[in-house]
Regions:
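HhH-family (HhH-GPD) DNA N-glycosylase catalytic core used in base-excision repair
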Residues: 1-331
Length: 331
């Protein structure tokens, strides 16, 4: 059930547009949206609590900031079943608002997976994790260009480097979030703004020429990618994304996991993921090939299995070489 609380005619310039709905089944707001964030000071996604998340985005290239909350329900109501309220500000708010339920996985159904024979083959710790985290959903934001920039900046570097670069580039090139968004939040740049980013800014942010060139190539195909974002098949989207030089299987999977709620996309060539998954199943490090072999029984739902492993609290041993931050500003 969905209910638009504030109509177009009733909304004033400074009042938010609102959308409230009852989720189908349990929903954990913070756990579902956390995958979109990059640290506590992310300029485009702030998790302020399990039931309060701020995001910024664009709708038809118009700025939007939005706050997801869970209004208090009837006494005794399971918190995972309470309504979701979204309040949005900015020129793109009313157009974006009907897409808000997809951001928290409203169309993501685990039912086929939960009732499948493959689910019964999951290791017991993952079955237990699924029962302990019934509100975990896969978000489908649809913001292909925005997620592409995040994924490209994360190529071949540490998370610290990527986060630092993203924050700096948005601080220099992005406009402040509309409405009462938390301090420091900004709206992702438009394709035109990215294309105008001077080379010295990429350099100063610590982004090497290969990654900045990939962002530029992506933004030069912005119109085509905005159409591609409407394709509901994440596998087709992954394939199409890889036609852009500099975007491979890892980057494409990282994008569609967030934009399309991709239940099967696996981030191969990730510096940590193969070992992480292999340690869970084999209690030993392993290759991408071994990871895919281990996940094969759950094809069609492999990303769900990866999310369950992460939600289980599994940690692989921390010995071995670490990827150290690199300073590309002197290259």
């Amino acid at each position: 059930m969905t209910t638009e609380v504030t109509t177009r005619g009733a909304r004033t310039e400074h009042a938010p547009a609102r959308w409230r709905w009852t989720p189908r089944g349990p929903l954990h707001l913070g756990q579902t949206l956390r995958v979109l964030g990059r640290g506590a000071e992310d300029p485009t996604c702030r998790i302020l609590g399990e039931d309060c998340v701020w995001i910024t985005t664009r709708w038809n290239r118009l700025p939007v900031s939005a706050r997801f909350t869970r209004p208090a329900g009837v006494t005794g109501t399971n918190p995972l079943h309470r309504d979701v309220l979204v309040e949005a500000w900015g020129p793109g708010a009313e157009g974006w608002l009907p897409t808000a339920p997809r951001w928290v996985g409203h169309e993501d159904s685990w039912e086929d997976f939960d009732s499948s024979a493959a689910f019964a083959e999951l290791p017991h710790p993952l079955v237990r994790t699924r029962h302990e985290h019934p509100g975990l959903r896969l978000p489908a934001t649809g913001n292909l260009l925005e997620r592409a920039v995040v994924a490209i900046l994360e190529q071949r570097v540490t998370a610290i480097e990527a986060v630092r670069a993203y924050r700096a580039l948005l601080r220099w090139n992005a406009e402040p979030a509309p409405g009462p968004a938390p301090h420091g939040m900004r709206v992702p740049p438009t394709p035109e703004q990215w294309r105008r980013t001077p080379s010295w800014q990429w350099h100063r942010a610590g982004v090497d020429p290969a990654r900045s060139a990939t962002v530029m190539r992506t933004m030069h195909r912005a119109a085509a990618l905005e159409r591609l974002a409407l394709d509901p098949d994440p596998a087709r989207v992954r394939t199409a994304l890889q036609s852009i030089q500099g975007i491979g299987p890892w980057t494409a999977a990282e994008i569609t996991q967030c934009t399309h709620g991709d239940p099967d996309g696996v981030s191969v060539h990730d510096y940590h993921l193969a070992d992480y998954v292999c340690w869970f199943f084999d209690h030993a490090p392993g290759s991408d090939e071994r990871m895919l072999e281990l996940l094969e029984p759950w094809r069609g739902h492999r990303q769900r299995v990866v999310r369950l492993i992460k939600a289980s609290g599994h940690r692989k041993p921390s010995f071995g070489p670490r990827l150290s931050p690199q300073d590309h500003r002197h290259h």
